[in-house]
UniProtKB/Swiss-Prot annotation:
Catalytic activity: tRNA(Ser) + L-serine + ATP = L-seryl-tRNA(Ser) + AMP + diphosphate + H(+); tRNA(Sec) + L-serine + ATP = L-seryl-tRNA(Sec) + AMP + diphosphate + H(+)
Pathway recorded for this protein: Aminoacyl-tRNA biosynthesis; selenocysteinyl-tRNA(Sec) biosynthesis; L-seryl-tRNA(Sec) from L-serine and tRNA(Sec): step 1/1
Quaternary data: Homodimer. The tRNA molecule binds across the dimer.
Name under which the protein is recorded: Serine--tRNA ligase
Pfam families: Seryl_tRNA_N, tRNA-synt_2b
Gene Ontology biological process terms in this record: selenocysteine biosynthetic process; seryl-tRNA aminoacylation
Main localisation: cytoplasm
Disulphides: none
Main function: Catalyzes the attachment of serine to tRNA(Ser). Is also able to aminoacylate tRNA(Sec) with serine, to form the misacylated tRNA L-seryl-tRNA(Sec), which will be further converted into selenocysteinyl-tRNA(Sec).
Molecular function via GO: ATP binding; catalytic activity, acting on a protein; serine-tRNA ligase activity; transferase activity
Record organism: Streptococcus pyogenes serotype M3 (strain ATCC BAA-595 / MGAS315)
EC nos: 6.1.1.11
Origin organism lineage: Bacteria, Bacillati, Bacillota, Bacilli, Lactobacillales
Length: 425
């Protein structure tokens, strides 16, 4: 959530930054007008309350002296009614301000490219060279069925579209991947966490999914619970409402969890395969950092995600998302896109973001600065390290062989009992 004081004092800068994120200046102007009206009413209310206190003392004095205070009482009752009217107006204005400010996206960092959509994203670097196949490549969904490791038909029967069963070496490959990812992140100083897979509405507000993106989630009817769309939500909210010791920062968390997405608005997109599911595993990285260190931590986090792809030998590229393509809470985002041979393109497999103090303000996560003793908002960062199902897809396609088998990447073999290849039965 943005700082209302910042909007008030640096209106033109904030308006210009949010314009690049598709926010109309009229929206901010209306917010500013509401804020000014609110501040005027607060002054009036305080003045009336001060006058009422004086009148109350005068009435008490008159009664002690057995004087007639009828008119003074009537005047004070009118003042009290005026105060109540103003307070009711303030409640209404506060709600209008909240309705606007809670759905305003974060302001982009100055280094973020300006653009409308993914066409304006900027490629930063590439790693690895896509393999030149001398046979016709298969899509991962066909490989999965032929190898008897992915079962889409029964997933649809048991649950519905965009669900599947992993089986045999497919299940072992999925498990090997997330254990490998967690082990690599732990080496980099991340604390492993097992989170709840349901959170409450306050947690969804804290990380920015609520109220704007409720349609993308799975809520449990008649409860305060929501299935997590990413482990970012419980990990970030771990410290919600707390003041941390600045000496302990930065703090790194990692967790593997299922992620549940309704994929509202994705009808017709990636209807086959592991790219877009309602339920999938993801290894998440979350950081809590001091403001002056957060962009260095973003680079480190992105490197941590890249490390996984490099050790798996999967070609990828790093993209800096433009202002029009970033997520709601992000101030800057790098996407990692892995090469998918059957589609002859790169597809997102990780997204690493610095939200600066946007989530921390919503969730009230602060730290006490050891330098001056002041309590300040910290910065939160989050990143995929990696989306496990998409990594399975990338391995199946990039490591496929002409005979229909798939070679298991060397770093995963210790996690799979020494297996070296997945072969057709």
């Amino acid at each position: 959530m943005l700082d209302l004081k910042r909007i008030r004092t640096d209106f033109d800068t904030v308006a210009a930054k949010l314009k690049n994120r598709g926010v109309s200046e009229d929206t901010l102007t209306h917010l500013k007008e509401l804020d000014e009206k609110r501040r005027t009413l607060l002054v009036q209310s305080e003045e009336l309350k001060a006058g009422r206190n004086i009148a109350s003392a005068a009435i008490a004095q008159a009664k002690r002296q057995k004087e007639d205070a009828t008119q003074q009482i009537a005047d004070m009752q009118k003042v009290s009614a005026d105060i109540k009217t103003i307070d009711n107006q303030l409640v209404a204005i506060d709600q209008q301000v909240a309705d606007i400010i809670t759905v305003l996206p974060n302001t982009p960092h100055d280094s973020v490219p300006v653009g409308a959509d993914e066409e304006d994203n900027v490629e930063i670097r590439r790693w690895g060279t896509p393999r030149d196949f001398d046979f016709e490549v298969k899509a991962h969904w066909d490989l999965g069925e032929d190898l008897d490791i992915l079962d889409w038909e029964r997933g649809a029967k048991v649950t519905g579209a965009r669900f599947l069963f992993y089986k045999n070496l497919g299940a072992r490959l999925e498990r090997a991947l997330y254990n490998f990812m967690l082990d690599e992140h732990i080496k980099e100083g991340y604390q492993e966490i097992i989170t709840p897979y349901m959170v409450n509405h306050d947690s969804m507000f804290g990380t920015g999914q609520y109220p704007k993106f409720k349609e993308d989630t799975f809520e449990l009817a008649d409860t305060n619970f929501v299935l997590i769309p990413t482990a970012e939500v419980p990990l970030t909210n771990y410290y919600r409402g707390e003041i941390l010791d600045g000496k302990e920062l930065p703090i790194y968390f990692t967790a593997m969890s299922p992620s549940f997405r309704s994929e509202a608005g994705s009808a017709g997109r990636d209807t086959r395969g592991l790219i877009r599911l309602h339920q999938f595993h993801k290894v998440e990285m979350v950081k809590f950092a001091k403001p002056e260190e957060s962009y260095q931590e973003l680079e480190k986090m992105t490197a941590n995600a890249e490390n996984i792809l490099q050790k798996l030998g999967l070609p990828y590229r790093v993209i800096s998302l433009c202002t029009g393509d970033m997520g709601f809470s992000a101030a800057k985002t790098y996407d990692l896109e892995v090469w998918i041979p059957a589609q002859n393109t790169y597809r997102e497999i990780s997204s690493c973001s610095n939200t600066e103090d946007f989530q921390a303000r919503r969730a009230q996560i602060r730290y006490r600065d050891e330098a001056d003793g002041k309590v300040k908002l910290l910065h939160t960062l989050n990143g995929s390290g990696l989306a496990v199902g998409r990594t399975v897809a990338a391995i199946l396609e990039n490591y496929q062989n002409e005979d229909g088998s798939v070679t298991i990447p060397e770093v995963l073999r210790p996690y799979m009992g020494g297996e070296t290849v997945i072969s057709p039965k």
